[in-house]
């Protein structure tokens, strides 16, 4: 039976990027691995950017709704 892929997590993605950066900074990876790791980090950062933009839009809508006058009870 195939394993279910865990749900995406911002915190996990950032931890993966930090781990990749540590590997890159070690200077011990062959060039092909450096390029592959850099691509993975770039993809994770793009995912994080989309996530943060979406959450910012949600927050903006919530804040905007706070500025609206309350609806009187019927």
From Swiss-Prot:
User: What is its EC class?
Assistant: hydrolase
Record Gene3D superfamilies? Exonuclease VII, small subunit (1.10.287.1040)
Gene Ontology BP term (one)? DNA catabolic process
Task: Please tell me where this protein is predominantly located.
Answer: cytoplasm
List GO terms (cellular component aspect).
Answer: cytosol; exodeoxyribonuclease VII complex
Domain of life where this protein originates = Bacteria
Q: Which Pfam families match?
A: Exonuc_VII_S
Q: Name one GO molecular function term.
A: exodeoxyribonuclease VII activity
Instruction: Spell out the subcellular localization from the entry.
Output: Cytoplasm
Q: What does the record give as EC number?
A: 3.1.11.6
Keywords from UniProt, A to Z, are: Cytoplasm, Exonuclease, Hydrolase, Nuclease
What's its catalytic activity? Exonucleolytic cleavage in either 5'- to 3'- or 3'- to 5'-direction to yield nucleoside 5'-phosphates
What's this protein's family per the entry?
Belongs to the XseB family.
* Record's function text: Bidirectionally degrades single-stranded DNA into large acid-insoluble oligonucleotides, which are then degraded further into small acid-soluble oligonucleotides.
- Which PANTHER family does this chain map to? EXODEOXYRIBONUCLEASE 7 SMALL SUBUNIT
Subunit info here reads:
Heterooligomer composed of large and small subunits.
Name of protein: Exodeoxyribonuclease 7 small subunit
